Structure formats: structure tokens, C-alpha cells
Amino acid sequence: MKNTHVDLICVFLSIFIGIGEAVDVYTNHFHVHLKEGGGLEDAHRIAKRHGFINRGQVAASDNEYHFVQPALVHARTRRSAGHHAKLHNDDEVLHVEQLKGYTRTKRGYRPLEQRLESQFDFSAVMSPSDPLYGYQWYLKNTGQAGGKARLDLNVERAWAMGFTGKNITTAIMDDGVDYMHPDIKNNFNAEASYDFSSNDPFPYPRYTDDWFNSHGTRCAGEIVAARDNGVCGVGVAYDGKVAGIRMLDQPYMTDLIEANSMGHEPSKIHIYSASWGPTDDGKTVDGPRNATMRAIVRGVNEGRNGLGSIFVWASGDGGEDDDCNCDGYAASMWTISINSAINNGENAHYDESCSSTLASTFSNGGRNPETGVATTDLYGRCTRSHSGTSAAAPEAAGVFALALEANPSLTWRDLQHLTVLTSSRNSLFDGRCRDFPSLGINDNHRDSHGNCSHFEWQMNGVGLEYNHLFGFGVLDAAEMVMLAMAWKTSPPRYHCTAGLIDTPHEIPADGNLILEINTDGCAGSQFEVRYLEHVQAVVSFNSTRRGDTTLYLISPMGTRTMILSRRPKDDDSKDGFTNWPFMTTHTWGENPTGKWRLVARFQGPGAHAGTLKKFELMLHGTREAPYNLIEPIVGQTNKKLDTVQKAHKRSH
């Protein structure tokens, strides 16, 4: 079913897109908006008249087009006033914009060295015979290479139930896919593929001496590498299809390249996997621009014939000095943000943490070369060293392909609900010592004991465990497909503006600034929310050092979420945050009625001063209890589902 009110959120989310490069870079790409009635042939004619090339219609638009001026260099520091004027003065053109370029980086850590379960007898399940399968510990962890046995994606049980990704296409938005690789070629969906870097239908990677453009091919193999063919390893959804969308391999990214990539063939592509984002340097704050945001919103509204496109995002490789809530892609409600763990359950040293991460999969384990991700590589070769959250996102996309095969009617929201309910704490833990201040706040947060603080596992108001690093835990393919088979479509989703404080408040140099909003969840209105999915705190502030400003959100049920952690490398004192939607999933399933508290404080050495200018609380969820009609398959229980169902009945 089509979800209501989604487009309303695009209005305020588009406010924050102006944050970009330190120095403006102008490309030879132009966004051209024709007057009403302007069609494709008109666009071709206008482009030719002024010496441009029309690359086609912009995704999620009716009369907007992507022009390229071949006479201009790819990037320059000044606008081209002459070329802009030609289009601007054309009587058939409503608006024209020369596009700025910006940076998007691949999220791959480079190593220092270069149906019913009772129907199956799982003890007799045959493992794949592919030569690298024994190294794919994240698919079947027997304790190899010092890992923890059974800490894996539990895919063999899902395969045994007959789910292998059949009829599901996942698009790899990256630097290209080697679709002639012997482990990929039979699972390549050419009709759903395109090269937006070169503007042709062949998304083949550009070879370089340093193998830099191997990223997309490696991600593709994680999902669809063929089984039992004697080549490399096996993909999570080895009977699925992969589409290549080449869009990273050019000097600068533009809004239209991103938008067209995310809006490409939404009726043929089920899942879009992205292992890239803004620079993971601990000081960048960036997110989708206007056209890209519109493409994502249209995707979740209209993709897959109204069920919604699935966007999977790598949470980021900035490590403990970064926060993925400063990445507008990973922190979006419309994407599923995936973090990683290594083979013993510990977080990887490059893992970022944030409250928008929904779940985790796996990536390379520590410094042991035997614990990388085994997958396909360029030149028809294999690799055992794929890594970073780049490797984690495709694993999740593969699991989601299995779930969509089990139940093709799942909406984009259904898949997020399934992720919350079937992900597992398993053996995941935070292996780093962290410096957490004592807030002195009365809530349900569980602090670490001893001299070393960690991101501990917490429990929200309806009994769901979550972790600031791992979200709701590691994906479990078998649990997900079993619950997917029994799933009932989620009730309609609504968006409640719960309150606004726009009077400036000074953040004290020591201690907390606490702002409170009391809400009834828009009770009695058409926007009433009684059962939460996503919560956003839309915040504006400036401070003497942006990276030393931390924010916490506490729900009426006592769940504490750190929506902005300290980023010691971020020394900004000018831009701050303007209408930035800090998102949390940690209050999933809770009743939002009551007092919400936003806590702002400084953390770090030196003198601090700052002003919090705005706090707006946005609640997203359902009026009806989302799980009331779901009954697990006979003989199969889901403890998390049972826990939340009981909590909802008690509060009804």
C-alpha cells in the first residue's frame, strides 16, 4: 500500500542541503527546468540550439533535464556566466542552475597490506563447494581464524528453506560492476543497469593500476556470486540479480547524477545498495541535495509499484571520532543504515556510531588477513580483503533480497520493522574505552561499570534491546524470512509535528541545557502517532567548537539516545547546524505521549560557548498497533515480537 504524508517531510529536510564543500566547485553539468509542457524532444532541441548535450530527464521530475556543456572543463571555481545566460534567456526555459560539484567517498577500509523450519533437517544441509566459502565466516562461522562460532548471518538455514534471492534485483550504486566476471555474469540484470558517469548502458569499471575501481565489483559479488561453480565464494542471495549503476567515477559528484542513480528503473530494481557517502573525516556535515532527496522520496512512495524502493546505506568509516548522524544519507528515515562487526563480535576500529543505525552485519576481523570479506574482484579474480562498512551494506542487501523473495508484498517500512524484530544482540560488543560524561539525568540508561566506559546494550520502553553502535543487532536471515512469511502489512504511517522551541538558549560552559516538549502525539488529529518508528529532533545551533557539542534526546518512557556525539576533529565555529534532522530509531515501538527532553552540553578541553536556536520534535509512526495481526508460523516463535505485542496490549 502507498504510504501517506511522506512528501510532507521532504519540505523541511531539503532545508539542510546547503552544507557542502569548503570552496565552491562548478561543473559542466546544468539543471534545466523547462516551462510547462516542455518534453524530451523540446529539451533535445533547446540543448542543441545552445551547444549543450541533453542527458535526459531528471528522476522524480516532469519537465526537468540534465544538460552537459562539452566546451567547459569538468570543474572550475567560477560560474560560466555566458553559458548560463544562453539557457536563462531562452523563452522555453523556466529556470537553470549550473551544478556545484562535491565529494563522495567509497566506504572501504584499505588494509595495511595490500519454508517451515520443521520441514528441513538442517543437520544434513550441504554447504556450498565454492573454493573461498570456508573463508566466508560471516556466512557460516565455525570459529575459523579465531572467530566466535555461530556469529554469522544464519543464511544456510534461509537457503535450506528455499530462499536464495530468486526474482529480486539489487542495484550496486558505485564505480561500476565487472559484469563479465565468471561469478557474476549469469546473475547480471543488464536491463536495469546504467552508467551515469559515461552516459551509456554499460556500467563497466574503469581499470586503474591501483585497482581503485574494484569497489562495486566486490560489493556485487557479496550479493550474487554464483554457488557451486568453482569460482571465488558465494553470494548471500546467489540466485538473485544484480544491476550496475556506475556513478562514482568522475572528478566530482553532482545532484543530478545522484538523483538519476537513485531513481533509475524503480519498477525493475528492488534494492539499491550504497557503500559511499560524504567524506568520513570527522568534521564533514553533508547530505542529499534537492533533486536527490526528491528521488529518494519518490522511490519510497512509488518504487516497486507502490511498495517502495529499499535503500541500504553503509553507516560510515570515520571511526570513534565521527558520528553517522552527520551524514544525511545514512541518517535518513528512508534508508536502512548498516554498521559492521568483526569475527569475534567486536566493533571494527573504523565503525562510526549513531542513533540512526538500524542494524549490523560483518566486515574484516581485526588485523588477521584471513578475516577479510571474500568476494569477486577485477580481471575475473577473487579477493579475501574486501572490508569496511562498504562490505557490510551489500551483505544486508543480500539478506533483504531473501526476505523479499519470501514475501514480495513487503513495503519499505515492513522491511525496517522486520529488521528491528529479527536482528539479534548475539555476541556483539563495544571493545573500545570511551569518555562519557555523567549527565545527572533521571532516565532508564544503563551506564558502564569500572574504569572503562562502553556503548552498552540498552532496553527501550517496549523491551527492545539496542546499541548505539550496532542498532538492534546483527541481521539473522533465517529469522527474517520466517517472520516475513507471516507478516501483515504495516498500518498507515503518519507524521506528527510534536512541538517547537525557537527561542535562543545559551548552552552553559559546564553542565546541561535541557529543553522540554510535552506532546500528546497529535491525538485526535489526522496525524496522530501512538506507536513510534522514527523520531527526529530538528536542531539549529552554533558554538565555539561544533565538534565539542553533544546532544541527547530522552523519550517519555525514559529511553536516552545520544543524537550527536563528540567529534574532536570538527573545529567549526561558524556554520554550526541549521535545521539538521538528527534521527533516532532507539524509541521504536514506544508511545510518544508525554515529556521529551533535549539535553545539550559541551564535552572536551578548553572554553566553550554556544547558542541553541531551535528544537523541533518530529514523530513518525502509526496510529494502530503495528503487530497486532501478526501470528508467527506454528512452531516458530519470535521473542522480540512477543515482547512488543505484550507491551502494546498493556498500554492500549
From Swiss-Prot:
GO biological process terms held by the UniProt record: arg-arg specific dibasic protein processing; determination of adult lifespan; dibasic protein processing; insulin processing; larval feeding behavior; negative regulation of dauer entry; negative regulation of dense core granule transport; negative regulation of turning behavior involved in mating
Effect of residue 621 to R: In nu349; egg-laying defects characterized by egg retention and resistance to serotonin and imipramine-induced egg-laying. Loss of localization to secretory vesicles in axons. Loss of FMRFamide-like peptide (FaRP) production in neurons
Propiece residues: 23-107
The name this protein goes by in its record: Neuroendocrine convertase 2
GO MF, one annotated term: serine-type endopeptidase activity
Signal peptide: 1-22
Tissue specificity field: Expressed in head and tail ganglia. Expressed in neurons including mechanosensory and motor neurons, and interneurons (at protein level). Expressed in the nerve ring, ventral nerve cord and intestine.
Location of the region described as Required for ubiquitination-mediated degradation in the Swiss-Prot/TrEMBL record: 501-652
EC number, UniProt record: 3.4.21.94
